């Protein structure tokens, strides 16, 4: 579960020319090597995949749904904040006749997007996605010597990849067989087969594509394959994908007239938290351990929480969020820059995920954690606005260094973050 390179390989056909394309789980953008089309993958909900059964297998296939979750989990405990990287799957049928998880199947088998052309029967999905975390924690508690879950005030999940995977099985002599392994599923009870198995007809195939052309000027949008934010270098605009098309994103850049600079994205979120009377930077200094020297002339500043707009390991995510929120970067920015020649690190964490991280950052900033953390579940976060800020970092051999504040980020940490 802690293998950071445990993503899937997905096989797809180019919707324009039909050529085969291979994707990784975290990819949002693909380019066809044949017709050169470049498309952004979107969905109106969870993406649905299936594991193809062996072609030589001559059986009536029954597909069983499994929830798949990959991301960072933050648990608020009496002892403090604990985090871990999760990579798990869970049977979504509501019965225990099949394996409870997919195990290593998604790493050893190539997946495909679920499509109307797929033949077979589908077991009904009964367990909603928001119920799987309680089941995961129950399993964790049974296996752990320390019964921590009873003291969890709240959980926050950041940077998650969530999908529904259909695994192939078949029935033979009143037993379920794993179609990939071509072997019977181990029995979990004396009752080997219920009188009936609930099936469903899949009607929603919620995957579609957007052309990566700027809606404003028609130029090619720039972004790496993992990017959730795309940049137009022609009209100097920034865009995010949605089910209804690309939408413009407000952004700022701290421009530096130097070479060897990479601009790294962070979300800057203006926030009011009425339950804690937090509206300004002075309010934050009141409940946080912020030195007076850092608070000079800032009493009336609006409160902004910061978060990386890219995926990184939880320790680094917390450090960057806390550091920029307590001592935000002060300097001249522009939202109408000439960005055609600038080097941008890809934004892989959407604004919705950054907003989810506000309580996590708050729990690390406040002095009286025993008082604040238990009430975090009931605290309402009122987001006024959010801005994508590109901060300049000087490129070094093994790290990048923030130009103004001089903190560093290891290049390997950024590389690993792209696989989360």
Question: What is the role of each PLM region?
Answer:
Residues 2-16, 20-23, 27-420:
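Long C-terminal interaction/binding lobes of large macromolecular proteins
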């Amino acid at each position: 579960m802690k293998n950071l390179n445990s993503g899937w390989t997905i096989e797809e056909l180019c919707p324009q020319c039909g050529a085969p394309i291979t994707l990784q789980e975290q990819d949002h953008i693909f380019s066809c090597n044949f017709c050169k089309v470049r498309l952004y993958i979107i969905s109106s909900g969870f993406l649905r995949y299936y594991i193809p059964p062996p072609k030589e297998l001559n059986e009536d296939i029954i597909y069983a749904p499994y929830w798949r979750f990959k991301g960072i989990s933050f648990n608020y405990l009496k002892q403090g904040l604990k985090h871990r990287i999760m990579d798990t799957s869970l049977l979504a049928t509501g019965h225990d006749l099949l394996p409870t998880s997919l195990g290593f199947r998604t790493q050893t088998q190539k997946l495909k997007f679920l499509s109307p052309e797929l033949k077979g029967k589908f077991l009904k999905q009964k367990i909603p996605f928001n119920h799987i975390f309680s089941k995961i924690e129950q399993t964790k508690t049974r296996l752990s010597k320390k019964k921590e879950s009873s003291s969890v005030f709240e959980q926050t999940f950041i940077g998650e990849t969530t999908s529904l995977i259909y695994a192939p099985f078949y029935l033979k002599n009143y037993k379920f067989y794993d179609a990939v392994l071509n072997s019977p599923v181990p029995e979990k009870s004396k009752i080997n087969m219920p009188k009936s198995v609930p099936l469903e007809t899949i009607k929603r195939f919620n995957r579609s594509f957007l052309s990566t052309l700027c809606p404003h000027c028609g130029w090619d949008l720039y972004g790496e394959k993992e990017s959730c934010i795309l940049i137009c270098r022609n009209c100097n605009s920034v865009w995010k994908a949605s089910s209804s098309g690309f939408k413009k994103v407000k952004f700022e850049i701290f421009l530096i007239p130097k070479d060897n600079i990479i601009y790294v994205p962070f979300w800057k979120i203006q926030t009011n938290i009425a339950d804690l009377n937090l509206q300004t930077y002075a309010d934050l200094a009141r409940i946080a351990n912020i030195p007076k020297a850092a608070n000079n002339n800032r009493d009336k500043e609006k409160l902004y929480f910061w978060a990386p707009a890219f995926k990184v390991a939880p320790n680094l995510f917390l450090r960057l969020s806390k550091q920029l929120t307590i001592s935000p970067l002060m300097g001249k920015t522009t939202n109408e820059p000439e960005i055609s020649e600038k080097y941008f690190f890809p934004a892989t964490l959407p604004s919705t995920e950054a907003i989810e991280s506000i309580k996590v950052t708050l729990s690390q900033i406040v002095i009286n954690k025993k008082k604040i953390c238990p009430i975090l579940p009931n605290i309402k976060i009122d987001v006024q606005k959010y801005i994508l800020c590109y901060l300049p970092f000087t490129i070094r051999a093994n790290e990048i260094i923030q130009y103004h504040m001089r903190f560093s980020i290891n290049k390997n940490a950024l590389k690993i973050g792209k696989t989360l």
